[in-house]
Design a protein with these regions (language model features):
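C-terminal cap of thioredoxin/glutaredoxin-like
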Residues: 2-47, 85, 98-104, 167-232
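Hydrophobic single-pass membrane-insertion segments
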Residues: 49-59
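A short beta-strand-turn-helix
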Residues: 63-80, 106
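Structural alpha/beta surface segment adjacent to cysteine/selenocysteine redox centers
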Residues: 78, 83-167, 227, 232
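Flexible, active-site-adjacent loop/turn segments at secondary-structure boundaries
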Residues: 65, 71, 120, 149, ...
Length: 232
Protein backbone atom coordinates (compact mmCIF):
# COMPACT_ATOMS: atom_id res chain seq x y z
CA UNK A 1 0.00 0.00 0.00
CA UNK A 2 1.24 3.47 -0.81
CA UNK A 3 0.02 6.97 -0.03
CA UNK A 4 0.57 6.32 3.69
CA UNK A 5 1.30 9.59 5.46
CA UNK A 6 4.29 10.21 7.65
CA UNK A 7 3.64 10.47 11.41
CA UNK A 8 4.04 14.22 11.21
CA UNK A 9 1.42 14.45 8.48
CA UNK A 10 -0.95 12.10 10.24
CA UNK A 11 -0.96 14.31 13.31
CA UNK A 12 -2.28 17.16 11.17
CA UNK A 13 -4.71 15.09 9.08
CA UNK A 14 -7.73 17.24 8.14
CA UNK A 15 -10.90 16.44 10.03
CA UNK A 16 -12.98 16.09 6.87
CA UNK A 17 -12.87 16.28 3.06
CA UNK A 18 -14.15 19.84 3.32
CA UNK A 19 -11.30 20.70 5.68
CA UNK A 20 -8.80 19.31 3.20
CA UNK A 21 -10.14 21.59 0.49
CA UNK A 22 -10.32 24.56 2.84
CA UNK A 23 -6.68 24.15 3.83
CA UNK A 24 -5.59 24.56 0.22
CA UNK A 25 -7.91 27.52 -0.32
CA UNK A 26 -6.74 29.41 2.74
CA UNK A 27 -3.18 29.30 1.51
CA UNK A 28 -4.07 30.92 -1.78
CA UNK A 29 -6.62 33.60 -1.10
CA UNK A 30 -8.02 36.14 1.30
CA UNK A 31 -11.54 35.09 2.20
CA UNK A 32 -12.67 38.16 4.11
CA UNK A 33 -14.86 39.50 1.29
CA UNK A 34 -16.42 36.06 0.79
CA UNK A 35 -17.31 35.79 4.49
CA UNK A 36 -18.95 39.21 4.52
CA UNK A 37 -20.94 38.36 1.41
CA UNK A 38 -22.04 35.01 2.84
CA UNK A 39 -23.28 36.64 6.05
CA UNK A 40 -25.26 39.18 4.07
CA UNK A 41 -26.77 36.51 1.83
CA UNK A 42 -27.87 34.45 4.81
CA UNK A 43 -29.99 37.22 6.32
CA UNK A 44 -33.54 36.98 5.05
CA UNK A 45 -36.57 38.73 6.57
CA UNK A 46 -38.83 36.20 8.30
CA UNK A 47 -36.48 33.23 8.12
CA UNK A 48 -33.23 31.61 7.08
CA UNK A 49 -32.41 30.35 3.60
CA UNK A 50 -30.15 27.50 2.59
CA UNK A 51 -27.26 28.98 0.65
CA UNK A 52 -25.50 27.13 -2.13
CA UNK A 53 -22.74 29.60 -3.10
CA UNK A 54 -22.09 31.43 -6.36
CA UNK A 55 -25.60 30.92 -7.69
CA UNK A 56 -25.24 27.14 -7.86
CA UNK A 57 -28.37 24.97 -7.50
CA UNK A 58 -29.22 23.88 -3.97
CA UNK A 59 -28.65 20.28 -2.97
CA UNK A 60 -31.59 18.13 -1.96
CA UNK A 61 -31.13 16.85 1.63
CA UNK A 62 -30.03 13.22 1.72
CA UNK A 63 -31.98 10.56 3.54
CA UNK A 64 -30.30 8.36 6.13
CA UNK A 65 -30.89 5.42 3.80
CA UNK A 66 -28.93 7.07 0.97
CA UNK A 67 -26.00 7.75 3.28
CA UNK A 68 -25.66 4.01 3.85
CA UNK A 69 -25.97 2.96 0.19
CA UNK A 70 -22.69 2.33 -1.64
CA UNK A 71 -21.57 1.19 -5.10
CA UNK A 72 -21.19 -2.58 -4.93
CA UNK A 73 -20.64 -5.75 -6.95
CA UNK A 74 -21.90 -9.15 -5.89
CA UNK A 75 -24.95 -10.49 -4.06
CA UNK A 76 -26.14 -8.71 -0.93
CA UNK A 77 -26.53 -12.17 0.61
CA UNK A 78 -22.84 -13.06 0.15
CA UNK A 79 -21.24 -14.35 3.38
CA UNK A 80 -18.26 -12.00 2.99
CA UNK A 81 -18.36 -8.25 2.48
CA UNK A 82 -15.14 -6.72 1.16
CA UNK A 83 -15.05 -2.93 1.54
CA UNK A 84 -12.50 -0.76 -0.22
CA UNK A 85 -11.92 2.77 1.05
CA UNK A 86 -10.47 4.53 -1.96
CA UNK A 87 -9.76 7.82 -3.68
CA UNK A 88 -10.22 8.62 -7.36
CA UNK A 89 -6.99 10.63 -7.14
CA UNK A 90 -4.97 7.78 -5.59
CA UNK A 91 -2.18 6.27 -7.71
CA UNK A 92 -2.13 2.99 -5.77
CA UNK A 93 -5.92 2.64 -5.98
CA UNK A 94 -5.58 3.15 -9.72
CA UNK A 95 -2.83 0.52 -9.95
CA UNK A 96 -4.93 -2.03 -8.05
CA UNK A 97 -7.91 -1.21 -10.23
CA UNK A 98 -6.12 -1.45 -13.57
CA UNK A 99 -4.41 -4.70 -12.56
CA UNK A 100 -7.82 -6.30 -12.07
CA UNK A 101 -7.26 -7.45 -8.48
CA UNK A 102 -10.85 -6.76 -7.45
CA UNK A 103 -12.24 -8.71 -10.38
CA UNK A 104 -9.84 -11.60 -9.74
CA UNK A 105 -11.03 -11.86 -6.14
CA UNK A 106 -14.68 -11.77 -7.17
CA UNK A 107 -14.04 -14.50 -9.73
CA UNK A 108 -12.06 -16.65 -7.30
CA UNK A 109 -14.80 -16.46 -4.66
CA UNK A 110 -17.70 -16.50 -7.09
CA UNK A 111 -20.92 -15.48 -5.34
CA UNK A 112 -19.34 -15.57 -1.89
CA UNK A 113 -17.97 -12.03 -1.77
CA UNK A 114 -19.76 -8.72 -2.10
CA UNK A 115 -17.41 -5.86 -2.98
CA UNK A 116 -18.29 -2.36 -1.71
CA UNK A 117 -16.66 0.97 -2.57
CA UNK A 118 -16.52 3.80 -0.03
CA UNK A 119 -14.89 7.18 -0.46
CA UNK A 120 -11.86 8.32 1.51
CA UNK A 121 -10.72 11.36 -0.52
CA UNK A 122 -7.40 12.12 1.13
CA UNK A 123 -4.82 12.36 -1.66
CA UNK A 124 -5.45 15.58 -3.62
CA UNK A 125 -7.37 18.82 -3.04
CA UNK A 126 -9.67 17.77 -5.89
CA UNK A 127 -10.37 14.31 -4.44
CA UNK A 128 -13.46 15.28 -2.38
CA UNK A 129 -15.21 16.75 -5.42
CA UNK A 130 -14.20 13.73 -7.50
CA UNK A 131 -15.78 11.53 -4.82
CA UNK A 132 -19.00 13.54 -5.12
CA UNK A 133 -18.85 13.06 -8.89
CA UNK A 134 -18.60 9.31 -8.42
CA UNK A 135 -21.71 9.39 -6.25
CA UNK A 136 -23.53 11.42 -8.91
CA UNK A 137 -22.58 8.74 -11.46
CA UNK A 138 -23.80 6.06 -9.03
CA UNK A 139 -27.19 7.79 -8.99
CA UNK A 140 -27.40 7.04 -12.71
CA UNK A 141 -26.24 3.45 -12.31
CA UNK A 142 -22.76 3.95 -13.73
CA UNK A 143 -20.34 4.38 -10.85
CA UNK A 144 -17.93 1.68 -12.00
CA UNK A 145 -17.96 2.88 -15.61
CA UNK A 146 -17.19 6.37 -14.29
CA UNK A 147 -14.42 5.04 -12.06
CA UNK A 148 -12.91 3.25 -15.07
CA UNK A 149 -12.88 6.49 -17.07
CA UNK A 150 -11.24 8.49 -14.26
CA UNK A 151 -8.52 5.90 -13.66
CA UNK A 152 -7.80 5.46 -17.38
CA UNK A 153 -7.22 9.19 -17.89
CA UNK A 154 -5.63 9.66 -14.49
CA UNK A 155 -4.96 13.00 -12.82
CA UNK A 156 -7.73 15.02 -14.45
CA UNK A 157 -10.00 16.04 -11.60
CA UNK A 158 -11.10 19.60 -12.31
CA UNK A 159 -14.86 20.19 -12.39
CA UNK A 160 -14.72 20.37 -16.19
CA UNK A 161 -12.80 17.09 -16.31
CA UNK A 162 -15.32 15.42 -14.01
CA UNK A 163 -18.15 16.54 -16.28
CA UNK A 164 -16.28 15.36 -19.37
CA UNK A 165 -15.95 11.89 -17.85
CA UNK A 166 -19.71 11.87 -17.31
CA UNK A 167 -20.25 12.54 -21.00
CA UNK A 168 -17.77 9.80 -21.93
CA UNK A 169 -19.75 7.13 -20.08
CA UNK A 170 -23.12 8.30 -21.34
CA UNK A 171 -24.59 9.97 -18.27
CA UNK A 172 -27.41 12.51 -18.46
CA UNK A 173 -25.25 15.64 -18.57
CA UNK A 174 -27.79 18.10 -17.17
CA UNK A 175 -28.64 15.82 -14.28
CA UNK A 176 -24.98 15.09 -13.53
CA UNK A 177 -23.98 18.77 -13.69
CA UNK A 178 -26.78 19.78 -11.33
CA UNK A 179 -25.77 17.03 -8.91
CA UNK A 180 -22.09 17.99 -8.96
CA UNK A 181 -22.56 21.77 -8.90
CA UNK A 182 -24.98 21.64 -5.98
CA UNK A 183 -22.73 19.51 -3.80
CA UNK A 184 -25.54 16.98 -3.62
CA UNK A 185 -23.33 14.24 -2.19
CA UNK A 186 -20.94 16.20 0.00
CA UNK A 187 -22.75 14.76 3.03
CA UNK A 188 -22.36 11.22 1.69
CA UNK A 189 -18.63 11.72 1.14
CA UNK A 190 -18.35 13.12 4.67
CA UNK A 191 -20.24 10.09 5.99
CA UNK A 192 -17.78 7.69 4.34
CA UNK A 193 -14.85 9.77 5.59
CA UNK A 194 -16.11 9.61 9.18
CA UNK A 195 -16.57 5.84 8.96
CA UNK A 196 -13.04 5.45 7.60
CA UNK A 197 -11.48 7.52 10.38
CA UNK A 198 -13.33 5.47 12.98
CA UNK A 199 -11.45 2.30 11.89
CA UNK A 200 -8.99 4.26 11.67
CA UNK A 201 -8.02 4.41 7.98
CA UNK A 202 -5.12 6.74 7.19
CA UNK A 203 -4.15 5.69 3.66
CA UNK A 204 -5.69 4.40 0.45
CA UNK A 205 -6.58 1.85 -0.67
CA UNK A 206 -7.75 0.42 2.64
CA UNK A 207 -9.60 -2.86 2.95
CA UNK A 208 -12.15 -4.22 5.41
CA UNK A 209 -13.29 -7.87 5.42
CA UNK A 210 -16.48 -8.53 7.39
CA UNK A 211 -15.73 -5.56 9.63
CA UNK A 212 -12.03 -6.38 10.11
CA UNK A 213 -9.71 -3.59 8.97
CA UNK A 214 -6.63 -5.00 7.24
CA UNK A 215 -3.66 -2.69 7.70
CA UNK A 216 -1.29 -2.51 4.72
CA UNK A 217 -3.11 -5.29 2.88
CA UNK A 218 -1.64 -7.07 -0.13
CA UNK A 219 -3.68 -9.17 -2.59
CA UNK A 220 -2.46 -12.33 -0.84
CA UNK A 221 -3.42 -10.94 2.57
CA UNK A 222 -6.88 -10.11 1.24
CA UNK A 223 -7.29 -13.64 -0.09
CA UNK A 224 -6.27 -15.19 3.23
CA UNK A 225 -8.65 -12.91 5.17
CA UNK A 226 -11.54 -13.86 2.88
CA UNK A 227 -10.73 -17.57 3.23
CA UNK A 228 -10.68 -17.21 7.00
CA UNK A 229 -14.01 -15.38 6.93
CA UNK A 230 -15.43 -18.30 4.95
CA UNK A 231 -14.09 -20.76 7.50
CA UNK A 232 -11.59 -22.36 5.15
Amino acid sequence: MSNKRSPKFQESLPASPAAARSLQTRRRSNRSQWILWLVAAAIVVGGVIIFSGSGQPAAVPLSADRLSVDPSIGPASAPVTLIEYGDLGCTTCRRWHLSGIRDQILKQFDGQVRYVWRDFPIITPQSPKAAEAGQCAFDQGKFFEYQDAVYRDFGKLSNDDLKNFAAQVGLDAARFDQCLDSGQYAAKVQHDWDEAKRLPVQATPAWVVNGQYLYNASPDKLTVAIQQALGR
